[in-house]
Amino acid sequence: MRVYSASLVLPITAPPIPCGAIAVAGGRIRHVGDREWVVHELRARGVAFDEVHWPGVLAPGLVNAHSHLQYTGMAEVGRGSYAGFDDWDDAFTPVYRAGHDWAQDAAAGAREMIAAGTTAVADIVTDVEAASALHDARLHGITYWEVMSWTNAAWAERGRAEVEARLDALPSPPGTGLSPHAPYSLDVEPLLEIPDIVRERGSRLHLHLGEAAFEREHGEAVPWQKQRPASFRALRDEGFGTGATEFVDELGVLGPDCHIAHGVYMTARDRAILRARGTTVALCPRSNAVIGLDEPPVAAYLVEGNALAVGTDSLASSPSLDLLADVAELHRLARAQGYVNRDLPELLLRAATLGGAHAMGLDTGPARTGYLAVGAVADLAFFDIPVSEVDATIEHLVVAGAGSAVATFIDGEARSASPAFTRETGVRA
């Protein structure tokens, strides 16, 4: 048994614990509470243990709910600044086609995420060489095979069989799923059948939604279902202003086993649809800014009660894979958009941990993660944040926590440890 104690422990599903501790054995959490109580309980039971103490913050490992690890080698694109999705895509495509070692790049991205305190990832894979990134890195999360550019005719001929084979070949653990890229990049038939493929296997769905301004609803709401359009683009070509969220909802894509990335171009009705379907939104504000999109409606999501998670996206559209940098940007946006409640830091930290786990169905069951509780896997992140009053410390972590991760444990195993953490605790990764 090992006890991990810290000046402040943040369980997420329980109140913050100053001078708190958790006890870990067999890769799982056995006790959570005040350090004196945890130590007393173990001694009273005659359980031998050693202790690792960090004079800072201990939190659950971060959960990155939207990424493309294979694009880690495309940081030159992410360092640019663009005037919208099409402008960014014009820069992305030639670099993508130049050829990369996708496996090596994805592995490098996984290491970077772990060093930043991340223990679970929603990773979208476009090229099969990158398919084992999460598995090889022993990260929790879901590997999603990306599905795009299928017409109805090609799908009927060979699409379903090909996609099923790709899905079934993904290495596990972690979990697996499919990512129908976006409403505008697939015809109707694949969008109808991909959810069935996933749900027959008990897998997960993840798609880009509300990332391109083209998806935004415009004009009066007009019934369109009887038109039986071949695709979202065909529907728009016929003059309908139906939004992409309503479109995929009618096709049965959304649900509690699905989460979306970005959610920038969302009306109040769109946001209500997501709530009604139990679909989480993974917000990626730094990626949106690089691409030149509008700001996501962070304050509206918070006020209306949408389930939220946080993602970095990839280095092809983001400055780093440090999730707390996106959390800080969400804090800035929420305040600028008029969210004044004092619970903002707590809500955003929850989104970056439990919210991401919930988005992928990892918050329940035997391998539950995203929070510190008895029976959960011991996915831990230690941060070099000075501890003062509890609320002020949490706000410091949220607003200025990027770059502060000093150690990351996955299943109770030290996977990253800074020199400062090793000097203080003796623990090496």
Where are these regions (language model features)?
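C-terminal cap of metal-dependent C-N hydrolases
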Residues: V374-A429
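Active-site beta-loop-alpha junctions enriched in small/polar residues
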Residues: H68, T126-D127, E146-W150, H181-P183, ...
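Alpha-helical scaffold segments that flank or form the walls of functional sites
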Residues: V57-L58, A75-A137, R160-P171
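Histidine-rich, glycine-flanked metal-binding segment
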Residues: M1-V3, P11-A59
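His/Asp/Glu-enriched, well-ordered alpha-helical/loop segment
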Residues: Q227, E250-L254, P296-V387
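Active-site gating loops and adjacent loop-to-helix segments of metal-dependent hydrolytic enzymes
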Residues: T72-Q104, I142-M148, A212-G255, L330-R342
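Histidine/acidic residue-rich metal-binding segments in metalloenzymes
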Residues: F49, A130-D136, G159-T280, G292-L308
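Histidine-centered catalytic micro-motifs
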Residues: P60-T72, R204-A213
